Amino acid sequence: MAHSGNGESFHDPLRGFIQRNCFRWNNQKLILQCFMALAFVGITSSTTQPDIEGGALLQLRDSLNDSSNRLKWTRDFVSPCYSWSYVTCRGQSVVALNLASSGFTGTLSPAITKLKFLVTLELQNNSLSGALPDSLGNMVNLQTLNLSVNSFSGSIPASWSQLSNLKHLDLSSNNLTGSIPTQFFSIPTFDFSGTQLICGKSLNQPCSSSSRLPVTSSKKKLRDITLTASCVASIILFLGAMVMYHHHRVRRTKYDIFFDVAGEDDRKISFGQLKRFSLREIQLATDSFNESNLIGQGGFGKVYRGLLPDKTKVAVKRLADYFSPGGEAAFQREIQLISVAVHKNLLRLIGFCTTSSERILVYPYMENLSVAYRLRDLKAGEEGLDWPTRKRVAFGSAHGLEYLHEHCNPKIIHRDLKAANILLDNNFEPVLGDFGLAKLVDTSLTHVTTQVRGTMGHIAPEYLCTGKSSEKTDVFGYGITLLELVTGQRAIDFSRLEEEENILLLDHIKKLLREQRLRDIVDSNLTTYDSKEVETIVQVALLCTQGSPEDRPAMSEVVKMLQGTGGLAEKWTEWEQLEEVRNKEALLLPTLPATWDEEETTVDQESIRLSTAR
């Protein structure tokens, strides 16, 4: 990190400038620039601070002997919570680590104990050896510990008796010997089978929570009598249940489906025709969440490509923040949202999986991926989006949002609409995806206040400043998406600083319009297009991205304007007049100095978010 000659950090004057000026400017462009600057300062400053948990994970990786380089963790990190695979975080603390069935052959480093907030540690089905770390007893937050099917040797350290919060302990199929702390036999789920640990008949304690101790001969007769009586009672109960079931079946509707998967979450969940998958089915479909199947990452978790036994391709969304207070709520919210939102331009949920440590959603796999991919990330030989398809995306997305806002009860706010969240089916029809950031609000409310979540460049200014989102927040994001469709560019692009001061696509478009350079707005990859249709979509986009939410149209109005029946000409004339006034006012305001050196602003543009990174 660069420093000035007097030892002052590069960020100090910039941070001071922001704090003195940004929050007293009532101007959309300057507000967005300030938030961008704050994001930049926060991200780059954090790289200078040591990350204890990140260092501990790197030590763990080294001790595991990751010869196949499965753990692509790097020392050039901000935090392991941002992008490291197999790591689950709550806030900025690691709470779960799942490294099962990974082919590791090393040892378990005591550095693992630096993960003070770890709740779940899964290392089963590897070839790890050596002694169990004594210091693991200090990890008092551990609830799930699975070290089964390895080659650990020695005894269970006495310090492990301090693990008072354990609910699931599996040390089976190891070379362990010696005694077992007495309190471990009171854990809800435990397994010491396949070891030489003292349990079973010799200790009169079971070796696993699912097994029973052998009964003595003095109790055999009583057991036989009890067993006979139980069988008779069971037969009577079974016959009674059959009668009740037949009577109930006549009355119930065919859509009332309950799910209860043994070994998973015991709660019964009814969600219509959704399929409940077992965790094993999901693991088989995704090759145990193999990183080679990773196709995306959002605010609530990673998305993997999967293949079901019937050869159906699916997209599996593994929620990353289940352990946080919002994790369970996020899962239930998404299930509820999809169950009430059914539209041809909305992504259909086909199933889910829930266990004590996992929340997973299963969607159809979209062969043509996302609009963002088709605009900017094509591989050699792949086909881009022609103008008719882009126009179809604009119309379909508008219809999908209109349905969420005006035809769902309660209404639904997406809150992260962008080209990357618009998927394309086999016929290149658009469907809105990623309802992990959606928010249900009561129809009697005009907005909902929550933490700011979304992608910088697509977030409406009032949402940035107040945290209040409404339908008009989505309208703003839709307008930016229209500009992405026309230009093929990102909502934020630092490379523009080489020629102008506008890093935001919205400001760049306004600049070109002032200079009457409409042709320069259109994506250079478009060889043919209708200039009148381009003009219409740009005008609608700018009406949708006005600074005041009250000035933005509702999505039903947007649909009408796109269809040519919404009075676009009159609204555009009014916008031009207001824009002229806004430009004059902007000239009287100070501007943010462009003091960022290109080499010091290497920030991943698609990853600049105001939500907690996962």
From Swiss-Prot:
UniProt keyword terms in alphabetical order: ATP-binding, Cell membrane, Glycoprotein, Kinase, Leucine-rich repeat, Membrane, Nucleotide-binding, Phosphoprotein, Receptor, Repeat, Serine/threonine-protein kinase, Signal, Transferase, Transmembrane, Transmembrane helix
Residue positions the entry lists as glycosylated: N65, N125, N146, N175
Signal peptide boundaries: 1-50
SMART domains: S_TKc
Modified residues (Phosphothreonine): T286, T312, T389, T449, T450, T455, T466, T545
Transmembrane segments: 225-245
Reactions catalysed: L-seryl-[protein] + ATP = O-phospho-L-seryl-[protein] + ADP + H(+); L-threonyl-[protein] + ATP = O-phospho-L-threonyl-[protein] + ADP + H(+)
Superkingdom per UniProt: Eukaryota
Sequence positions bearing Phosphotyrosine: Y463
Intervals, Extracellular compartment: 51-224
Modified residues (Phosphoserine): S370, S470
Subcellular location: Cell membrane
Active site feature: D416
Cytoplasmic side, ranges: 246-613
UniProt repeat feature LRR, residue ranges: 115-139, 141-163, 164-187
Molecular functions (GO terms): ATP binding; protein serine kinase activity; protein serine/threonine kinase activity
Membrane topology: Single-pass type I membrane protein
Alphabetized InterPro entries for the sequence: Kinase-like_dom_sf (IPR011009), Leu-rich_rpt (IPR001611), LRR_dom_sf (IPR032675), LRR_N_plant-typ (IPR013210), LRR_Rcpt-Like_S/T_Kinase (IPR051824), Prot_kinase_dom (IPR000719), Protein_kinase_ATP_BS (IPR017441), Ser-Thr/Tyr_kinase_cat_dom (IPR001245)
Main localisation: membrane
Enzyme Commission identifier(s): 2.7.11.1
Protein kinase domain boundaries: 289-573
UniProt: ATP binding residues: I295, G296, Q297, G298, G299, F300, G301, K302, V303, K317
Cellular component per GO, a single term: plasma membrane
Protein family per UniProt: Belongs to the protein kinase superfamily. Ser/Thr protein kinase family.
Protein name: Probable LRR receptor-like serine/threonine-protein kinase At5g63710
